[in-house]
Structure formats: C-alpha cells, structure tokens
C-alpha cells in the first residue's frame, strides 16, 4: 500500500512538508515494510513543539550503532548533551529544545566497529558549502506561483520536447569566479532558453556533492540542493521562475552509487548499511563508489523519498536517472561478481526497485517524466510495469554512438559507414527515445562537438550544422549540452563559465541561429514531433546512395487528417564536401515545394546556395511518383515542404 499522504495542490504539499509524522512504532514499521514513500516526513530534522516547548526532533536509521548523539551549534558540538534514544527497528530519535532552524548539526555515531564518526544527516535538507559537510536545520518555506504550469504538466509523448542540458555551476559565473545564486541563474537562464526555443532544461550538479570534479554524480545530499548556489528556497525560486516562463525542469538523479566519503552514507553505522556488504555487489572499482543495497526496504524508501522530494516539494518535472545499466547488471564493469538466484547476471533487486520507483512516481507525481540513461539493449525500459521497467523515456545511446562515429569519419570514407545513419530506424519504435548529446560527449579528450568534425574550420562548422539538422529531423525528443548550441570549440570545463564571448563572432552566432531555427520548426511542425515511435513517422526515400553519402527521408504526422494529422516534410542530407547540382530526389506528390531550412544559408554561416526550380517532375524516382531536382550544397541538410501551388517570391 502506498503512503496515503499525497499532495493534491502546492498548498497542501507545503503543509505536509512542515508537519513531520509521529515518530512511533506504526510509522517506523511502515518504513521498514516499504509502505512509507516519504520517509523524510519521519526522519531527519524537524522543528516541532512538544509539551509546549519549541525545538527540533531528530531521527536517524543506524541499526548496528552502539551509541548515537546529535551534535551541533545548539550544544557546542558536545556529544554528551543530547544522546539519542534507541527506537524500534534500528532507528534513533531525540528532541532538542535548544535547536533552531539555520543551525548546523551532525549525528555522532559510535558504530559496530567501535569507531566514532560525525555523519551528515542522510535526510538533511540543506548543507554547508563544501569543503564543510555539516547538515543545516532547514524547513522549506516558499510561496509557489506556478499553479498553471503544475496543472498541465505531462510527459508529452506527442509534444515537442527539446532539452537544454545545463551544469548549474559552470553555465555562467560571477565576475569574481564564484557561482551564481539560483535566483540570478533563474532570470538569465530563462531569458536565454526562451530566446533559443528550448522547451525544458535538464540540470546537473544540483544535488549536494562534496567534489566539484564529480559534476554532481557523487551525491551526499539526496534531499538537498547544493549550497554552492544558495539555499533551498533559492533553488525553488529557480524552478518556479522557469515554470512561469513556460519552461520545464528536469534534474539528474543518481540512485546507482554514492561516494565513499566518511561523513556521508558509507558504513553509516560502522558497517555496510546503505550499500551491499559484499564488495562484489557493493563497490564500483571504476568509480570508487559504493552501490546501494536495493534489497533493503529502508534503502529503497530512502531513494524513492528522495525522488518524490524533488518532484513534489521542489516541483521538478522529471528525473534523468543516471547510470541505469550499472544498476541492472551484476557484472557491470567487473570481473568478479555474484550471480542472482537464477544464476543470471541481472540484478533482480535493482530491477524491482526501478519498477517500484516508477510506479510510485507516476502515482504520486502524475505528469512527471522518468528518463533512463541506459546504455544497453535491456528490454522494455520504457514499457509499463510489471513487464517493463516503467520509464517514460530512454536516452538513445545507440543512435548517439553510431551518429558520432559516422560524422567523425573523413567524408572520403563515409560511404563505407553509410548504414550508421540508417540503423536507428531498425529499432527506434521499440522504446520512447531521447536523442541526447550530453556532457559526456564533450569531455575527457573526446573534443567539443564541432571539433569532432573533419576538415578545416569552415567544413567543421558545415558538418556540425548538418549533424544538428539531422538530429532535429530524426524521430525522438532532443537534448543538447550547453555550449554546443553555439559551437564551443573547446571541451567543457566544470571549473569555468562557458566562453560566452565567442557568441559575438559570426561563425559561432551562425550555429546558434541554426539551433534556434531548428527548435522553432520542431515546435511548430507536428510532423517533426508527433509519431516518434510510429513506423509511419519516418519514411526513407533514399537510404542507399553510399557513393554520394546522400540521405533523404520524409517526416510525417501519422495521425488521421480528421485529427489534424497528415503534415509532412522532406529532409535531404549531402554529407560530403561536394556540390551536387540537379540531384534527383523522389517525392510522393506533384506541384510546388519550398525550402523550410537549409544549413547552407548565410544566416547560419554557409554560402546560401539557391534552389532555382522546386517544381516536382512527373517522372517517378526512389519509389515515389514524382521527383525534384535539387542543388545540394556541400556538407548540408535541406528541409522542404510541399505547398501545392507556386509560392510567392518572398517565400522562396
């Protein structure tokens, strides 16, 4: 049974967040039996009044601890002043009359190993700025004004979703090099995202983490926005403002592993608690991190409660679940591993957790998106439970790898890799995909996106523009990491702001103009965003011209015309630096056509090649009833639509 405490409105949610549950046997038992999906309403630090006395109630799970006390600003960090009482099921609790919101605290745990360690609150709502690690008593108090957005949010399967991936610590910085406050970021980011035409932002580096170089993927504060950019209310302001501007918010969430930092979750009660005890299951050698024990109800509820904290309390619209493949397989990146009860390599406990997570989220936070970064061919990632994992979307890692491999090839040899750009069509209808070019593709000597392209600076930009146009006209939602929308030439550096000064240069501004135009077309045209998983959503016209490296395909709105469907457009890509005059491309209808977009336009940094004749010839071609004779600029993509009659000259 799910926790009956469920918010029906932001006002109700605010009330729920301010009223902790009684710390009694019944509620503790619900947590242990996985029936309490918001354990943060029970554990952690909560200002309360007991017997007319104001104070803070502290509670923590440490079943094998020998002794636990709460220390902080309210008692001079003296471990003898406020010992905690051992409660049922391995929980500890204490009421501290002298404690107040804004004060720092930790749990001083004498563990099963006899060592005494000061631990951060696993459910802490706010934390000191790194390198300090104390938790801070902090009840969230924010007046939301995004009701209109919250009432209509949806996973948006047949809506345009174009995501701008942003590392909150390095998108922009103050003149002194320090981080922007969330409120400063809110206005600057909303203005830019609106200008560029994205529908959503995906924020990484939001959850509290001790090491900047982890980019936020080694989390110690699963319930706390990082204090680098301000207080929890400041983060709430960021989300609220983006919603008021019509922009959705997704955050990266990391339930696959956690860091070994002594102050964090590691060996919390002097022995493995949140992590598997067997290092063959519980330790990532590649990442030097621990793996959550998904078989423990208390751990499962800790993670599910964290997800709901962001989706309910902070009004976030979706979670991008990191490193799902590492959770699904017991032999992931390891030579020594423990088979499951059936002798297989699948982590059955992690699979059960992911299914439960998605079921709870879709029940408790309807309209939110759950997105899996899953890099294998695990079946049914976006299929409903119980047979699938229940995610809404999955990153198209296969599309990304194949497409980047192709575009990194010298055009002379691309004909030998022609299939790399058509193979996605074989499996694209099997899942709900997001075509993601993320931060992972522009670090660790992989080069920035434009720098991956072969040739001189002009051809690199031409090739990158063609890549972007093919990405935006291929079925699937879109995600592009910050800086790549203006062809940043260097790899991402998390310690520095983006090089915004280059956007004043025409060659970078041109790529920026193209991304803006692509977002506009994508949002305006249903043929480009409806029917991603329909066979009829993309029809190949020319998929076999390997010698010329030319591709042509139709994007179609597969809905019946009575429901507003039937719109279509034609994309033609010439992916060599060779001008092709009068190239024949089959089309399904006669009459006039017009160019919606050419990546060779001068506005985008190209030469502005013209199309003198866009009247379809009656001779069939490529299995179609008619054909066009097109002038294909070098390293370019054209997007055309059928207009039926001769367009006016100003439309050409």
Curated annotation (Swiss-Prot):
GO cellular component, one term: cytosol
Catalytic activity: Transfers a segment of a (1->4)-alpha-D-glucan chain to a primary hydroxy group in a similar glucan chain
This enzyme's EC code(s): 2.4.1.18
Keyword Methyltransferase found: no
One GO biological process term: glycogen biosynthetic process
Assembly behavior: Monomer.
Function in brief: Catalyzes the formation of the alpha-1,6-glucosidic linkages in glycogen by scission of a 1,4-alpha-linked oligosaccharide from growing alpha-1,4-glucan chains and the subsequent attachment of the oligosaccharide to the alpha-1,6 position.
Family membership: Belongs to the glycosyl hydrolase 13 family. GlgB subfamily.
Protein name: 1,4-alpha-glucan branching enzyme GlgB
Gene name as annotated: glgB
């Amino acid at each position: 049974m799910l926790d009956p405490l469920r918010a029906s409105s932001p006002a109700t949610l605010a009330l729920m967040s301010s009223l902790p549950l009684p710390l009694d046997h019944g509620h503790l038992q619900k947590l242990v039996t996985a029936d309490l999906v918001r354990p943060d309403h029970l554990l952690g630090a909560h200002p309360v009044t007991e017997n007319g006395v104001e104070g803070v109630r502290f509670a923590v799970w440490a079943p094998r601890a020998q002794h636990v006390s709460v220390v902080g600003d309210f008692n001079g960090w003296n471990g003898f002043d406020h010992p905690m009482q051992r409660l049922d099921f391995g929980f500890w609790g204490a009421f501290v009359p002298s404690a107040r919101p804004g004060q720092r605290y930790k749990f001083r745990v004498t563990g099963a190993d006899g060592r005494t360690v000061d631990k951060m609150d696993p459910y802490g709502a706010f934390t000191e700025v790194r390198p300090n690690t104390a938790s801070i008593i902090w009840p969230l108090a924010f007046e939301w004004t995004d009701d209109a957005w919250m009432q209509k949010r949806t996973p948006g399967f047949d809506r345009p979703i174009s995501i701008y991936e942003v590392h909150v610590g390095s998108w922009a910085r103050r003149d002194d090099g320090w981080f922007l406050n969330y409120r400063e970021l809110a206005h600057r980011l909303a203005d830019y995202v609106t200008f560029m035409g994205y529908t959503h932002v995906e924020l990484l580096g939001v959850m509290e983490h001790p090491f900047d170089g982890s980019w936020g993927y080694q989390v110690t504060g699963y319930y706390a926005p990082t204090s680098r950019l301000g207080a929890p209310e400041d983060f709430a302001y960021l989300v609220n403002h983006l919603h008021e501007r019509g922009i959705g918010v997704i955050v990266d969430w990391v339930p696959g592993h956690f860091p070994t930092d002594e102050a964090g979750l590691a060996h919390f009660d002097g022995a493995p608690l949140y992590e598997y005890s067997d290092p063959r299951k519980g330790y990532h050698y590649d990442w030097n991190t621990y793996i959550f024990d998904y078989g423990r109800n208390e751990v499962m509820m800790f993670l599910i409660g964290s997800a709901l904290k962001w989706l309910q309390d902070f009004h976030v619209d979706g979670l991008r679940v990191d490193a799902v493949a590492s959770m699904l397989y017991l032999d992931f990146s390891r030579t020594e591993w423990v088979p499951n009860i059936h002798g297989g390599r699948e982590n059955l406990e992690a699979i059960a957790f992911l299914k439960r997570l998605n079921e709870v989220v879709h029940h408790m936070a309807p309209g939110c998106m759950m997105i899996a970064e899953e890099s294998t061919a695990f079946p049914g990632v976006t299929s409903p439970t119980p047979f699938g994992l229940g995610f809404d979307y999955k990153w198209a890692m296969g599309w990304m790898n194949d497409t980047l491999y192709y575009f990194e090839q010298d055009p002379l040899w691309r004909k030998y890799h022609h299939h790399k750009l058509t193979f996605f069509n074989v499996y694209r209808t099997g899942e709900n995909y997001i075509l993601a070019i993320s931060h992972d593709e522009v670090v660790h000597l992989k080069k920035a996106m434009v720098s991956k392209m072969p040739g001189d600076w002009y051809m690199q930009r031409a090739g990158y523009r063609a890549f972007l146009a093919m990405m935006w006209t291929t079925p699937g939602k879109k995600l592009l990491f910050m800086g790549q929308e203006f062809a940043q030439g260097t790899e991402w550096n998390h310690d520095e702001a983006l090089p915004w000064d280059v956007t004043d240069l025409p060659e970078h501004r041109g790529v920026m103009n193209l991304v803006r135009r692509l977002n506009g077309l994508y949002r305006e045209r249903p043929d480009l965003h409806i029917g991603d998983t329909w066979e009829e959503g993309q029809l190949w016209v020319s998929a076999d011209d390997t010698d010329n490296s030319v591709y042509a395909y139709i994007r179609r709105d597969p809905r019946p015309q009575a429901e507003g469907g039937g719109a279509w457009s034609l994309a033609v890509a010439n992916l060599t630096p060779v001008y092709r005059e009068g190239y024949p491309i089959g089309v399904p209808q006669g009459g006039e056509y017009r160019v919606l977009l050419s990546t060779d336009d001068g506005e985008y940094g190209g030469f502005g090649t013209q199309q003198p004749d866009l009247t379809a010839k009656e001779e069939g071609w490529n299995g179609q009833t008619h054909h066009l004779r097109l002038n294909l600029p070098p390293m370019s993509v054209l997007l055309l639509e059928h207009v039926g009659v001769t367009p006016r000259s100003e439309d050409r």
